[in-house]
Amino acid sequence: MKNKLQITLTTILLCCSSLIAQNNQISLNSGYTNQSFFSMQNGEAQNIPNDDWDLAFSTDAFSSSIRINDGKGVELYTYHLGDTSSWNNINNSTPNILINPMYNSDTDWGYGAFDTNQTGGFDYGWGVYNLQNHHIIGDSLFLIKSINGNWKKLWLEKKVSGEYQFKYANLDGTNEISQNILATNYADKRFIYFSLDNNIVMDREPISSEWDITFTKYITLVQGMPYAVTGVLSNVGIEVAQADNVSSPLNYTDYTAHNFEQTINTIGYDWKSYQGSYVVDPNRCYFV
């Protein structure tokens, strides 16, 4: 049986100062294997598999954010016993001593799992910004469990003029691969993706201006613990307001009574609850 999310969207079209109600059904397929990008004006922009990539590199010239497919099972750890000179010290037993898994932010696209250890200033978590040549130089090693469950060691070596340079290998050092991704070639997208097991760059998003929200799996804190949920994240610059305790959500149009936020998980996952099957909150709506 397919897992489907049926949503009712009330869209604010500022160009014509009117409210339009639309009924749309989004399918993420059995096991929530897909991701859907949705435009309030044009409907579903893209529906694609979400279980075939590991890394997502920001294409923004002023961002160094790198995210992982944590909602679908990718795991990331810093190698805490040494710096980049310790590449050859990592081996097949290293996963047994790993601590503190890292996750993407679910409130800001600009803060990925690889950015977790940043200390502020010119430290970006996975690397340090060089004021003289404007390069970001990788100063950390990582261990990553791919979407297919394979462990790799990874060094994000640098970002230079919009190009990410990195290498990865099996934990025993075999099958070492060096890769370059020129993110500026995909500037009209939010991220450019990469599969570690297949060693391929993946252009899988619609153009950034062509979607407003995405239905996907991601990690969030549930009762203080990181947990994979299925929910809705909004695009950069999209403002969302939540209205609760509404007796007739389909007919409710007073968006001015609510605060709009650009936090990407404003819609999030908690508009539904599990009661043997998922039940949508009948007294909540959102304005986008």
Language model features with spans:
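Surface-exposed, beta-sheet-biased, low-hydrophobicity segments with strongly acidic/polar composition
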Residues: Q22-V288
